[in-house]
Design a protein with these regions (language model features):
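Non-catalytic pre-domain segments flanking phosphatase-related domains
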Residues: 1-37
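N-terminal helical cap/lid subdomain that shapes the substrate entry/recognition surface
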Residues: 30-118, 125
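Conserved Lys-Pro-Asp/Glu-containing loop-to-beta segment of HAD-superfamily phosphomonoesterases
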Residues: 34, 168-195
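Conserved H-loop
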Residues: 64, 89, 151-156, 181, ...
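A short, structured active-site edge motif that brings together acidic residues
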Residues: 70-71, 152-165
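Short, acidic loop-to-helix structural element flanking the phosphoryl-transfer center
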Residues: 106-133, 139-143, 168-169
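Surface-exposed amphipathic alpha-helices with a cationic face
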Residues: 118-126, 175, 195-199
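Acidic, Mg2+-coordinating phosphoryl-transfer loop and its flanking beta/alpha structural elements
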Residues: 187-228
Length: 240
């Protein structure tokens, strides 16, 4: 069984300068002390490359390839429905993720940020005490990507779980590390499993609709926020 990481509070030069810069800004109405983001599909536009890698590995695992014409259909499926549709046995998932993320490392620095996220992340960082990432990708891939886009130093931590359903325990561990009440932390993700993990952990969730799962499927799970474009994050800075 995978255990949540023993996170350490960290401070970076950018984090300190961000907090100092906050003194020159109007008082923030942000109610969250910590923001935690999913990576693939939320911050990084990795979905096309992920599909390419998945299709390369599919013959080795005896599973279905994902054709371009069915991508939109897959956006409406839950994790269980997706695994069933692609004929992926749950026991093969950890190996598939490990091999896939290893291959992804070779192209991660060439991939794009979600358009508009750089400015939004930089602005949000000013208004919170801590900023992090919780992902099923590897910390090494995330680190390389963020450094390539000049954003690594605004993040205090990168947490990773190789289990597709393991994020709930990690969210609880992050909350404990930073001594937060549940309502003081927000997780941001693009998948149904992100919404469900946050709800299981009792932590507010913002679902973004530009990633893997569709707006319709995300809305059905009743997240606390739904954002259709990065600038919608600015709603967090307005009085509630």
């Amino acid at each position: 069984m995978e255990k949540p990481p023993a996170l350490k509070k960290t401070s970076t030069p950018t984090s300190r300068s961000s907090k100092a810069h906050a003194k020159d800004k109007p008082a923030s109405t942000m109610k969250f002390r910590t923001l935690v983001f999913d990576f693939d599909g939320t911050i990084a536009d990795t979905l096309g490359e992920t599909r390419k890698i998945f299709n390369e590995l599919a013959p080795d695992y005896g599973i279905r390839r994902v054709d371009e014409h069915e991508v939109e259909k897959l956006r409406h499926l839950s994790l269980k429905q997706l695994l069933d549709h692609l004929e992926i046995p749950k026991r093969r998932v950890p190996s598939l993720i490990a091999r896939g993320t290893s291959i992804l490392r070779g192209s991660i620095t060439r991939l794009d940020l979600i358009q508009g996220m750089s400015e939004v992340l930089t602005e949000l960082r000013v208004h919170v005490e801590s900023f992090g990432i919780l992902t099923s990708n590897t910390p090494e891939n995330v680190d390389l990507f963020l450094r390539g886009h000049g954003l690594r130093e605004i993040f205090d931590f990168i947490s990773s779980t190789s289990k597709l359903t393991g994020k709930s325990k990690h969210l609880k561990a992050i909350r404990k590390t930073f001594s937060l009440r549940a309502e003081e932390m927000l997780y941001v993700g693009d998948e149904l499993r992100d919404v469900k993990a946050s709800q299981k952990a009792g932590i507010p969730i913002a679902a973004v609709t530009w990633g893997f799962n569709s707006r319709e499927s995300l809305a059905a799970e009743k997240p606390d926020f739904i954002f259709d474009q990065p600038k919608d994050f600015m709603r967090l800075l307005k009085p509630h």
